[in-house]
Each structure stands twice: as structure tokens, then as C-alpha cells.
Amino acid sequence: MGKFEQKERERISTFSFPTTGSQSSTSIKSLGSPLYGRFSSLSSTESQFDSSKQPHEYEKSFYFEESQGEALFNKLKTYSFPGDKDGVKTRRNSSICPRKPNAVSPLRVESNELSSHSHSRSLSHELTKPSGRRKSYHRKSHAISFSRSCKPNFIDGYDSNSSIGVNSRKTSLASSFLDKEYHSSPDTSYTHQMSPKNTIMNTNEQLRRNASGRFGSLKEFAEKNQINIEGKIFAHKVETGDILQPLIDLDIDNK
């Protein structure tokens, strides 16, 4: 072991935290223990409860010491020994668990004071601002332009180069569209018109199905449609083993 490495190990092993208030210093060993932080074990003097202190004073000093310990730990983790492996250095230099300031820590108290002060300033600024129409942040939509393929027929009757104003043009287009919808026949507008040829073909097909849909028995139906009904039971077909009128014996217990 080199002289420099031995000196560093002795310095780290004898290091201790500075005392804060009436509480004693904590050994560096508590840093490596899983109970380091807010769950670290207290000494005999720290475990004694002072009745003169309020609970929030204990909590405030507790979180203040914790934030100091975290700051010191972040400073110490930058140190490394020459014999350390790369994995140890990486874990030591990595951020373990970055946390936000606690609810009653001095950092949180100062941030709350600053935020409340800025909020009061912004509120006073809003009150002194002259009243008017609120600025809209909605995204503007573009007007829809009809293409050649989807342009309605009634638009063709108007000349785009005419001297009619934009508003009057819109009104005339809308009224023309409404008049056309009102005077148009509901049959031609909302029903699907089939050609006579398709109607005749569908009628002939339906007649053919009705003519060939009557069979003397289930066996004849199965033979014409090439269906195997052996060992199968069909509803309301006695020849297949179905019971047309099943009976329920209510006096089964009396027998």
C-alpha cells in the first residue's frame, strides 16, 4: 500500500460529521449503512425528548440535518482510491436518488416564500391590467376548399369572377343548397335506387330458392344438399330421435 493511499484511508476512517446544535456528531460508518438518512439510529442524547421544543421544531431540525448530510455525501462520493475498480467508481459517481426538497426543509421554505411572493406580484399585475378580450390560443382552422371531385353541383352555376361580395355569395350558395334539398324528392335523395335488371335477377333467384326449398322429409333434404345426418338429432324430427313433447315427471319422489 502506497503512502498516499494509506494517508487517504486514515483520513477517511477518522472523519466525522460536524456537530449541529446540541446533537452529537455521527460517524462516517452511518453513511454506508442502510439506515443512513432519516432512518439513522440516534444516540442516547438524541433519543431523549425535550418537552420544551415543539414537534415542528424537531421536524425542521431533523430535515435540516438530513439535507446537510446529503450535501456532504454528494461531496464525498467524488473521492476515489487508486485501487478501486471501474464499476465501483461508476456507482460512486452516479446519482443515487435525486430528491426534491422536503416539505419543511429550509430549501422548500425558501422556495415557497419566493413562489408566494412571485404569485402575489403576478396577481397584482393581473389586477392592474386593463380589462379586454382575452387572447385566444386556439389553433386557427383553414377554410375548406372543394376540389373538382367533391364539388357540389350547385356551385357550378355561379361565376367565380363575378362582382358579388363574399358574404352575399355565401348567403346565396347556402340558400340555393337549402332550396334544392327542400324541393328534392325524398325517394331520390335518401333511398338506393336499384336498376330493373337487378330487381328481376333478385326476384328470379328468390323464386328459385323458394321452389327448391320444399322437401318431403329430412332425409330428402340431406340427400339433395349432400349433408350427413347419421347419428345426429334435429329439433322436431322424430326420425332422428327428437322428442316432440318432452314431459317432466313431477311425482318422481312419490314412486
UniProtKB/Swiss-Prot annotation:
Residues 131-142 have a biased composition (Basic residues). Disulfide bonds: none annotated. Transmembrane segments: none annotated. Residues 1-12 have a biased composition (Basic and acidic residues). Disruption phenotype: Increases sensitivity to copper. Coiled coil: none annotated. Residues 1-32, 82-142 are annotated as: Disordered. Keywords: Phosphoprotein. Residues 13-30 have a biased composition (Polar residues). The modification Phosphoserine is found at S217. This is Increased copper sensitivity protein 2. It comes from Saccharomyces cerevisiae (strain ATCC 204508 / S288c) (Baker's yeast). The lineage of its organism: Eukaryota, Fungi, Dikarya, Ascomycota, Saccharomycotina. The gene is ICS2.
